[in-house]
């Protein structure tokens, strides 16, 4: 079961789109690691997603981003050796939360770390594009780190036209759902807002089952946008003039325990129009995080 003589595989942690992840141990140092094992198709060579992930991960060194220690390339396998993290945010919420809901203090500390990780990505011209509780890993010290850059991609200026297939539906920004292909850093900010609400309640904020259903969930809560609230929205490929018109709801109905300062940040993250969303840098300077400001 050895990935190589250097690491011992201990147990299987999960399977992703193109990889299996094991908990492992460095035979020499005894250090625990996560081994991401990618089977290489002899015809196709290394999947481009894997190559993208590797080249990005090796550059991104930050305390809120999972560290990639090593890449071991054998004939038919690619092994990525990551730092080992105890659990993901979803599991943390299920085991530490009250029916999944976390205390405000904990939500704040995790959000601060999440936004620091996002800022570091964005400062390095990288979009994560697939932020969700399962991609945020927590270690025993309570540190939160961004993982799984399978879909991430360095973005240049001018804005590239990206492929449409990104971000798990529940955390997907309305501009992406409406078919915009010129999205930018603001798509990660929307996902962060969805994750913040979910930490408060223990439930996904917008649990849509299809592209249209996802938009319906969003509009029902945040209000249906139109040309006056979001100029040029009607030019987006998936826009329909017959979207049901909803008025925005008060989020305190869903998150009664949220205070006004936290609500202000949440609403800044969850702006329908991407240009209106707060940036990662601005969000870290928000008064809700005052206690972390030196």
Swiss-Prot record:
InterPro entries membership: CDK, Kinase-like_dom_sf, Prot_kinase_dom, Protein_kinase_ATP_BS, Ser/Thr_kinase_AS
SUPFAM superfamilies given in the database record: Protein kinase-like (PK-like) (SSF56112)
GO terms, molecular function: ATP binding; cyclin-dependent protein serine/threonine kinase activity; protein serine kinase activity
Biological process per Gene Ontology, one example term: positive regulation of macroautophagy
SMART domains recorded: S_TKc
EC class (word): transferase
Domain Protein kinase: 7-289
UniProt KW Transcription keyword: no
Catalytic activity: L-seryl-[protein] + ATP = O-phospho-L-seryl-[protein] + ADP + H(+); L-threonyl-[protein] + ATP = O-phospho-L-threonyl-[protein] + ADP + H(+)
The entry's keywords: ATP-binding, Kinase, Nucleotide-binding, Serine/threonine-protein kinase, Transferase
Catalytic residues of the enzyme: 130 (proton acceptor)
EC number of the protein: 2.7.11.22
Amino acids binding ATP: 13-21, 36
GO CC, one annotated term: cytoplasm
Organism superkingdom: Eukaryota
Primary role: When phosphate concentrations are high it phosphorylates the PHO4 transcription factor thus establishing repression.
Family: Belongs to the protein kinase superfamily. CMGC Ser/Thr protein kinase family. CDC2/CDKX subfamily.
Subunit: Interacts with a number of cyclins.
Annotated protein name in UniProt: Negative regulator of the PHO system
């Amino acid at each position: 079961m050895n990935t190589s003589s250097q690491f011992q595989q201990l147990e299987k942690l999960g399977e992703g789109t193109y990889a299996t992840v094991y908990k492992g141990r460095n035979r020499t140092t005894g250090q625990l690691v996560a081994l991401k094992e990618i089977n290489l198709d002899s015809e196709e060579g290394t999947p481009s997603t894997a190559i993208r992930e590797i080249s990005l991960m090796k550059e991104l060194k930050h305390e809120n981003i999972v560290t990639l220690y090593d890449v071991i390339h054998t004939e038919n396998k690619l092994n990525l050796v990551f730092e080992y993290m105890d659990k993901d945010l979803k599991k943390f919420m299920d085991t530490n939360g009250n029916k999944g809901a976390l205390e405000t203090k904990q939500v704040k500390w995790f959000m601060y770390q999440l936004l620091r990780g996002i800022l570091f990505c964005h400062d390095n011209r990288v979009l994560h594009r697939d932020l969700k509780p399962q991609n945020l890993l927590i270690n025993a010290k309570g540190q939160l780190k961004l993982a799984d850059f399978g879909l991430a991609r360095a973005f240049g200026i001018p804005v590239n036209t990206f492929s449409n297939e990104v971000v798990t539906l529940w955390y997907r920004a309305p501009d992406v759902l409406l078919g915009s292909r010129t999205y930018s850093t603001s798509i990660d900010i929307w996902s962060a807002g969805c994750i913040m609400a979910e930490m408060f309640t223990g439930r996904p904020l917008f649990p849509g089952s299809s592209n249209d259903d996802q938009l319906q969930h969003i509009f029902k809560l945040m209000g249906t946008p139109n040309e006056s609230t979001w100029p040029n929205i009607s030019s987006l490929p998936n826009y329909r003039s017959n979207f049901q018109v909803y008025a925005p709801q008060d989020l305190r109905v869903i998150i009664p325990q949220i205070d006004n300062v936290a609500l202000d940040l949440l609403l800044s993250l969850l702006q329908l129009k991407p240009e209106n969303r707060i940036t990662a840098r601005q969000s870290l300077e928000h008064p809700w995080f005052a206690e972390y400001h030196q």
